[in-house]
Amino acid sequence: MRLAFLPLILILPTTHYAATPINGWYSGLFAGYAYIPSNVNKVNYNTRYTDATHKAGYLAGGNLGYKSNPLRYEAELSYFNANVAHFSQNNIRQDNVGGYNNGISGMANIYYDFSGIVSCLEPYLGFGIGYAWLREQLNNLTSNTQTNFRINSSAFAYQGLAGITYNFAENYAINIGYRYIRTPNMFSFGTTFQSHFAVLGVSYRFDDARYK
């Protein structure tokens, strides 16, 4: 029975000494896992490219924001990349392939931080709008049908975000979250772009004198 309470005993001292989050300016860095579904449905020189699936990718970026509890306002810049696993040409799957899907997004986000049972833990929800610059490179490496197809495009983008922040010091916090980004239908890709991210981030708050 005593062992059952051991995790709680270990957590309580940590949360007791953790800090209440403060209002003011902050900046942060984040990185994580990217899952990019198929986002190409395009005909090029009588060849249709579809079903471009990708290997596990990554996301990295930074942000600058202002917290006015319970809201946060933030500008964000991020880069993501995932290599191509396979794609189809004229509905025939191609497995001997190369290529990638990458992009840069600049977003303006707004968050709502929920006060938790423990003051240092804050679940959050967020929404952002901005612009994304995207590139898809599809290379068929089979010798008798070798092709290279590249798409470059940019579009309005929006995203939803959710996660939890742990304020382990008055000026520092870490957060773990999920985000989903999407664009409207893009002519160059023949469909919408969308991606899922699992993200770990760290933030530094500049103004250590302005408490909630």
Task: Tell me the role of every PLM-derived stretch.
Residues 19, 65-139, 198-208:
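Gram-negative (and chloroplast) outer-membrane scaffold detector with strong preference
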Residues 27-31, 62-64, 73-77, 110, ...:
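Membrane-embedded beta-strands that build the outer-membrane beta-barrel scaffold
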Residues 17-65, 201-209:
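Short glycine/proline- and aromatic-enriched beta-strand/turn motifs that initiate or cap beta-hairpins
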